[in-house]
A protein has these predicted regions:
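ABC transporter nucleotide-binding domains
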Residues: 4-5, 12-210
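A short local structural element in Rossmann-fold oxidoreductases
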Residues: 73, 218, 296
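ABC-family P-loop ATPase nucleotide-binding domain
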Residues: 1-11, 301-305
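ABC transporter nucleotide-binding domain
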Residues: 171-261
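Generic structural marker for isolated residues within well-ordered, non-membrane alpha-helices
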Residues: 98, 111, 214, 237, ...
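A generic structural signal for secondary-structure junctions
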Residues: 80, 102, 106, 201, ...
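Short, charged/small-residue-rich alpha-helical element at the C-terminal edge
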Residues: 223-301, 305
Length: 305
């Protein structure tokens, strides 16, 4: 599989603040590549440097063999970037909007075909202000496709959407990938990364902590299961850290979470601990590891923090 993006020691500093710290990775042609991390991790800055929209402090980005920061105009001709709805021209219909963006690339655009691809044909004569949040996001992706890009960049594409609109957008992104377009996206939704991405880079505090397929990240994390529960008395989380099989114990919003490498050992130990210390456990759930758990083990905090 050929490499379409090659990032080497990419760094961005603002005075004493390091926003992106010497990260390196590659993206394969035709894959959906995700950068997963909380707000402030450096995801958007990384994307903007790869797109050529933000200068770099040091390092190098090659996109389809082109040095992004030496030949930014050549790069912009082969990439698509998701725009925010505030970037759109007021007073134009969706059809006129796509044709206008096409003209900026010197291309004659089949606007209706693009609108069909993003399931907005019935809104062709509407203006952006008349669209729902999910429809605006689909339009922004259509704009990113006007130049038939080799790589489409999506920055937090489903933030703020309701669950159904989010899943509709996932279907759209999957169809774009199936058409042969490489997709690079950032997200702080672990389920989104698991569903959409062939490979995921977990990013925190300006660094890439781990990079692999979602399956391998889960398999090699050393995290097999998570036990979540509430108790009817005030308990310190330290109560549970020494239980058999517990790799990590945390408490958030009155929910205790035990990351266990062996739940068959941990559960009996937990129930014995309950009996010994005179509290009652309720709302107990046992679930398989997710990328949220992998992130927690790597960083010691949740994606929401």
């Amino acid at each position: 599989m050929s490499t379409i993006i090659d990032v080497k020691n990419l760094t961005k500093k603002y005075g004493d603040l390091t926003a992106v710290d010497a990260i390196s990775f590659s993206v394969n042609s035709g894959e959906t590549f995700g950068i997963l991390g909380p707000n402030g991790a450096g995801k958007t800055t990384t994307l903007e440097m790869i797109e050529g929209l933000k200068g770099i402090t040091s390092g190098q980005v090659l996109l389809d063999g082109i040095n992004v920061h030496e030949r930014p105009r050549d790069v912009k001709a082969i990439i698509g970037v998701q725009l925010q709805s505030s970037s759109f021209f007021d007073g134009l219909s969706l059809k006129e909007l796509l044709e206008t963006f096409g003209a900026l690339y010197g291309r004659r655009v089949d606007a209706m075909s693009l609108l069909e691809k993003v399931q907005l044909v019935e809104k062709a004569k509407s203006q952006v202000k008349e669209l729902s949040g999910g429809q605006k996001q689909r339009l922004s992706i259509a704009v990113g496709l006007v130049n038939d890009p080799k790589v489409l960049f999506l920055d937090e594409p489903t933030t703020g959407l309701d669950p159904q609109a989010r899943r509709n957008l996932w279907d759209l992104i999957t169809s774009i990938k199936k058409s042969g377009t490489t997709v690079v996206l950032t997200t702080h939704y672990m389920e989104e990364a698991e569903v959409l991405c062939d490979r995921v880079a977990i990013m925190d505090h300006a660094k890439i902590m781990k990079l692999d397929t979602p399956t391998n990240l889960l398999r090699n994390s050393g995290v097999d299961s998570t036990i979540e529960f509430h108790v009817d008395k005030k308990c310190a989380v330290d109560h549970f850290k020494s239980l058999a099989g517990v790799a990590q114990a945390t408490e958030e919003d009155h929910t205790f979470r035990l990351i266990s490498t062996n739940p068959e050992e941990t559960l009996p130990a937990l129930f014995a601990h309950e009996k010994e210390h005179g509290f009652n456990i309720f709302n107990l759930q046992l679930r398989q590891a997710t990328l949220e758990d992998v992130f927690l083990k790597l960083t010691g905090r949740s994606l929401r923090e």
